[in-house]
Amino acid sequence: KKMMNGEKVAGCERCYKEEEWGNEQTYRKIWNHIYGDKYTELVENSTTKDGHLNTMQFYRWDFRFSNLCNLACTTCGPNCSSLWVEILEKMGNSTHGQKFKTSSQNKKLFFDTIIGQANIVDQIYFAGGEPLIQPEHYEILKHIDSINRIDKIEFLYSTNLTQISYKDQNFVEYWKNMKNLKILVSLDEIDESRLNYIRYPAKLPAIIENIKILNENLTTEKQRWMVTPTWNILNTHRIKNFVEYFHENNLFPQAFYQSSEWEGDIHNIILLHPNYLSISAAPDFWKEHLKKQLNIYEEWYKDQIIPLKNWHVRDVSIQRFDHEIKRFYNALNDEITIDSSYHQNMLEPLDKIDRKSTRLNSSHITISYAV
C-alpha cells in the first residue's frame, strides 16, 4: 500500500542506497523498465485499495528455494547458506534456524501453483543458496523441458559454479538449448588462498574449469555468462589483479568483446551488508588505499582492456566503466558507523595470507563473521 502511494519502504533499503551511489541496475529500476507496460494489467486492474491482489500472474519467477549451499562465504550467513548453519552449530551456536530453509511450508502446493503458470512465464531467475545443487531447480527445468518451453523463456542464474551437474544430469545440456541465457558467476578472488578464505571452501581450479566449459558451450549472442564479484573491504584493493587474471588466462566471455555488459556486471555488486565488510565502513587509511588502487585500475583498464573489445563497443564500454567506477568512489565517500573494534582485526587474516601464511582453515571464516 505504501508503494502504491509512492512512499519508501524498509524492504527496499538496498535499492535506495545503491541508487544513491549511482547504480542504474537496481531491481527496482530494472523491473520498472522491463514490466512497465504491464503496470495497468498487473497493478491498477488487479490490486484493491488496501494493496491486496485479486489475481496473480507470474511472468517472472525469482527462485531462492532454500539456503542449501556448499559454501560459507565471509560476506554471507546462515539465512542464505546451510554450510554456515553447520559451522555455527559446531561452534555451539544453534540459534540460527534450520539447515535447509525452504521457501514454502507446502512444497506440493508451491509446485502446483508454479507449474500452473509455466505456460505464461517469460523469465526465470535461479539464485540460492546455491541453485545448481538444489533439487527444486532440477525439477523445474525438467518440467519446462517437458512442455517444450526451454527455448522460449529467458533464464538467469546466480551461481558459485563450483559444480554444474546434479545426479546424472549435466546442466550444460539444458543450457545449450536455451536461446536466452545469462549465468552470473559469483567469484570474489583469483588467488586460491584468499578465495578459500572469502568463499570457504571454494576451490579455484574447479571453478575455472567450469568457466572454460561455459566458454566452449555457450556460443550464441544470447547465451552469456559474466563474473559478478561482491566487492567489499577484503577484495576491492585487488580489483585490477582480478581482471588481469581473466585477461592473462584468456577467460573473457564472448560478451566481453561484443558489448558493455561486462563493465556493468563485473562492477555491479558493491557490498552493503554485513555493513562491517562494506567499503563505506572501512577506516580512513584503507579508504585512501582503495582510492589509489581504483585510480591505478582505471588507467590500466582503459589502456590495456578496452582496446581488446570490438571497436564499435569501445566508446560505450568506457562510458559504462566510468559510471560504474564512480559508484565505488561514492561508496568510499559515504560513511557507515560501526563499532570501532571491527576495524582492529578486520584485515589481519588476509594480511597473513598476503605474507604467504599457510594457517588457513574454517576457523578464520567463523572469526571474520563473528567480529
Where does each model-flagged region fall?
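N-terminal pre-core extensions flanking Radical SAM catalytic domains
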Residues: 1-101, 117-119, 309-359
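Leucine-rich repeat
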Residues: 5, 111-117, 142-148, 172-176
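Alpha-helical packing segments of well-folded alpha/beta enzyme cores
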Residues: 8-11, 61, 110-113, 140, ...
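Glycine-centered loop/turn positions within well-structured domains
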Residues: 10, 71, 192-193, 365
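Core AdoMet radical
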Residues: 58-68, 79-106, 118-136, 147-167, ...
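Distinct, well-ordered alpha-helical segments
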Residues: 136-142, 166-174, 238-240
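Conserved C-terminal portion of the radical SAM core fold
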Residues: 156, 178-184, 203-357
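Single conserved hydrophobic/aromatic residue that forms the stacking wall/gate
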Residues: 356, 360-371
